Amino acid sequence: MGKKVLLLSGTSEGPVLARALLDAGYEVIATVTTEEGRVHLFSQLQHALTVAVGGFSEPTLHAFLAQGGADLVLDATHPFAVRITQLAATVCAALQTPYVRYERPDWQPPEGTVYADSYAAAAALLPTLGSRIMLTIGARQLKYFAALHERLRLFARILPALNSLQQALQAGFSQETLLCLRPPFSRAFNRSILREYTVEVLVTKASGVAGGVVEKVMAAEDLGLKTLMIRRPAPAGLLTVSTPDAAVRLCQEFLGITSTREGVS
């Protein structure tokens, strides 16, 4: 039986990494948080790997790895998914299971971009930057801005999912202030949205090139708008790679080189 890699996924890099691992001869167990994510990310690879829907808690991940569920963990969760990254790194350290963090490449935005180190800090800064705000930070984080509805005109772009809508409504947003859309979006499309809603400030997070931040920020730059960027948490002390090839090489260092196979179609 081949060596098994647990791929903690949920972003667009997941299928790319899975394909690279499969081509290198590893068995892959990929995780996503929702059934929608499974279909969206892994429908073309579903016959080549195992996809587990639902996240791990610390006890369930510990049990899975302790029982031989995987020989290595490749963490390709979102750059802002700090909880699962810390959880996985802690469990792997306790079990001496190799852990590798895939960190998508960052991007340097234009001069004049305003930065905040947290969502709460961003909310405190917003009233000094403008009054018509477009939030593109994910529905779960909108709660940090709920207190600003009486002072500012807030709009939010969220995923077209029921749980996202519920989180946005609980944060005080109305149907008129929500855009339920699934990325990716072009620079021109971002520009048209910002113009249509007469936005003065774009709020986004440093989620990297693959996260669509370039198209958003450059659209705001085209229109002369301000951008408030929430900094990415630093993966302190973690073994990190930023390309699929580098991820495979580290797997080979830890697990040995397996017999590669034909590319997965």
Question: Locations of the language-model features?
Answer:
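C-terminal functional extensions of proteins
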Residues: 194-197, 201, 206-209, 213, ...
